[in-house]
Amino acid sequence: KYVVFLFYTYKIGIMNKLSREKMCKKEKKEILRILLPPIFTFLLNSVVYWGAPLIKTGIVAHNLSSSVDRIVPFMPQFIIIYFGCYIFWVVNYLLIAAQKEEHRYQFFTADFYARLICFVCFVFFPTTNTRPELTGSDIFTGAVRFLYQIDKPVNLFPSIHCMASWFCCIGLRKCENIPKWYQNLSEIIAVLVFISTLALRQHVLVDVFSGILVAEATWQIS
């Protein structure tokens, strides 16, 4: 009986070990399933944003600013929103990647199409804008000065900042496991991002609305 007991104890131990290994593999697979789509999106965005200016077409850049854009005052404090939205994107894209497969596939397919549209626009319809002369010495103006140094006035139409922020709202629609308050908060943050792009003179109204339109259109056809 003692031998039988040892045998069954050993058997149970082996089964538990195999079960744990199986669970571990399943967890790793789930983590990869969530992480890979956002990582691919980040890489594609880098190719689009930094690759488009390398293609020289000789097309003169258009300035799409209007008198309405000049109504919005320059507000360097919005640099907090402009830089902070990267955290917003990471959080929401991971939340969306954790949804059901059909929803996740539709979202990242739409995002893929949208980035390609941006690439085509950046190459064949280049735009630029006029930035203000920065004279302040406060921390916010200093941050905007840094932004202007690392981000030249190219790749403006449509606005990727606005497009990605609106995608963060689109991707949470009809997600019953995401609280309604967070969906509403995401919409508020997205609107603040829109305002920040205008207040910092990074974009004009046409860029903002085109970014939203591209996100909505690609979502509908995906």
List PLM regions with ranges.
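Short hydrophobic targeting helices and cationic amphipathic motifs
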Residues: 6-8
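N-terminal transmembrane-helix/juxtamembrane module of multi-pass inner/ER membrane proteins
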Residues: 16-88, 144
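Alpha-helical transmembrane segments of integral membrane proteins
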Residues: 29, 33-41, 105-113, 182-186, ...
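Hydrophobic, lipid-facing residues on alpha-helical transmembrane segments of integral membrane proteins
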Residues: 39-51, 88, 108, 112, ...
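Aromatic-anchored segments of alpha-helical transmembrane domains
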Residues: 46-47, 115-121, 188-199
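Membrane-interface loops
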Residues: 52-67, 97-181
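Membrane-interfacial alpha-helical segments at the cytosolic side of multi-pass membrane proteins
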Residues: 90-94, 162-178, 186, 212-222
